[in-house]
A protein has these predicted regions:
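A conserved beta-strand-loop-helix scaffold within acyl/acetyltransferase catalytic domains
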Residues: 1-76
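A sequence-level detector of short, solvent-exposed, charge-rich linear segments
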Residues: 22-29, 120, 131-134
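Aromatic (often tryptophan-rich) hydrophobic motifs at membrane interfaces
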Residues: 43-133
Length: 134
């Protein structure tokens, strides 16, 4: 419940910057994942500052390929380095055997893409779009 409250606050503060309505599209997926974290074997971590959630992340791990998948990561943007810190600590504590980390889609947002590229990925996957033929 506390994570949902933090997420709603995070959304409200960013909606006026969202030129492509990505936040609204993402919101439904976030709430579904929050509601089903345990049943789909996801791990969740958070950071508290002054007694309140300042960041949270949700991910999963595939041992056969030693890869952690970071599905969601949100943090107070005013706190410099918090995104990096939660990313580091979550991987250390939840997925210490991970050799690879999949940071998933950047939703076509330049700032998100730049942040993900700053981790110096070893490979970027091609994106494909499927359209139903009518």
């Amino acid at each position: 419940e506390e994570v949902k409250e933090f997420h709603e606050k995070w959304l409200d503060e960013r909606r006026h910057y969202d030129r492509f309505n990505c936040i609204d599209d993402e919101e439904e997926g976030v709430y579904r994942l929050l509601g089903n974290c345990k049943s789909i074997d996801c791990a969740m971590g958070g950071i508290r500052m002054d007694g309140k959630i300042a960041a949270y992340t949700i991910g999963s791990y595939c041992p056969s390929i030693q890869c952690a998948f970071i599905h969601i990561e949100k943090a107070e943007p005013e706190i410099k380095g918090l995104y990096n810190y939660i990313n580091q600590q979550f991987l250390i504590h939840e997925f210490p055997d991970a050799v690879y980390v999949n940071r998933e889609d950047d939703l076509g947002q330049d700032n998100l893409r730049q942040a993900k590229l700053s981790y110096k990925p070893i490979r970027l996957e091609e994106k494909y779009y499927i359209q139903e033929k009518r």
